Amino acid sequence: SQIEQLLLIFERFGNITDHKGLQHALANYIYDESSAANVVGNIEPPTPSLTDLLHREHVQFITSLPGSWQQAITQASASLLKSGVIEPRYLQIMLDKIADEQPYIMLAEGVIIAHAGVDDGALETGMALLRLPSKIDVAGYMQADIIIVLATNNPQKHLKALAQLNEFLEFYDGGNVIRRAPDEYVLIKDFARHS
């Protein structure tokens, strides 16, 4: 089911201590989101989709390989820093986490998703994507040519976009769609078509 799929995704990003609770929360989120939106006085903004987060300013293809994986993640994060989605410390925590903890952050072959925690300097929910011309070694334990940076200051706000991204990568060969896109605008249209 959709819930089980989401649980599998979240397992990869941290230890879930209350499976039943999360399952219940996800079920409510997925099936009641539209009805919740109709409650009078509910001013909670809608949960952003993949295309809500990956605007043109947050998608960049580069033609020369950065000198290090740290530079690559810094470059991937630049638009989020510039637009005030994250503070500089969020970037530093991400880099330290990868170097020190070597978390498993590969979503698909060559595609990594770097992130820190909700209290690590994320001011709102955002996502950015950087496509490299070839794979770069990341901290000696991964090879990646597509770097996605995810930030959220709310533990639920990124779930819809993350689920859509995972589906895009898994069911539409999304990694290769990203690699083959002639430019950023075409890729954004591809995301819109599949989400």
Identify the residue ranges that each predicted region occupies:
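Cytosolic covalent-transfer regions centered on His/Cys nucleophiles
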Residues: 1-195
